[in-house]
C-alpha cells in the first residue's frame, strides 16, 4: 500500500483548488504581508539563533513564559524534533489522524501503535483511554481538533489521557495547529495544563490559521 504524504504537493499536477492542507481561505493577514515587504533588507542577515524577539512575541500572544517556547520551521519539523529528542521506541497515534506523526516515528526507527477512534460515533475518543492503558509506549500523539475528522477531544477524556500518560512517564505531544479556528481557543488549549503536566508538549504553527504555509514557521510550548 502506498503511504500518503503531507498535502500541498500541487506542483506536478494541474490544481486550481487545493483541499489537501486546509489553509485559511481568508488568506495571509495584511500586516504579515506588509511586514515582509517592508523588511526585505533583513533577509540579507542570519536570524537570531535563539529567536528571542519571536519567542517573546509568541509568549505575549499565548500568555505563557517565553522560556517555555521553542520555534522551528513549521509543525512538521517540530514533531520530528520531539521524537528525535525523546527517542521513544513505541508511540501511540490515533487512527485516523495526521500521517506526519507516523512518518516522524518511523524516521527515527521507532514503532507506531494505533488507538482507534470510534467510527460509529463520529470518530470519537470514548475508547481512547482504555486502549492507551494497555499500550507499552513512551510517547502519545493527540491532535485537537483531530485532522482529518475535525472533532475536538472532550475535556474529561483529554484530562484522562494526560493523567494516564503522566502516571506512566509517557510524553504527550498535543498538536493544536487547527485549534485557533475555534473562538474558544484560549479556554480549550492544552497550554492551561502546562503547570500540571511536565510531560506535555504542545505544537502549533502559523501555517493554517494565518495562511503562512510558505514561510515555514511553527512553535512548541512545554513546561521544561
Spans of model-derived segments:
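Conserved core segment of the aminotransferase class I/II
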Residues: 50, 63, 114, 195-224
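N-terminal "arm"/small-domain region of PLP-dependent enzymes with the aminotransferase-like
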Residues: 1-45, 170
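PLP-dependent aminotransferase-like
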Residues: 85-142
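Phosphate-binding glycine-rich loop
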Residues: 51-91
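Active-site pre-lysine segment of PLP-dependent enzymes
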Residues: 123-136, 148-168, 172, 176-210
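Short glycine-rich anion-binding loops that position phosphate/pyrophosphate groups of nucleotides
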Residues: 22-24, 75-76, 98, 144-148, ...
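Hydrophobic/aromatic residues located in beta-strands of well-ordered beta-sheets
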Residues: 69, 91, 112, 172, ...
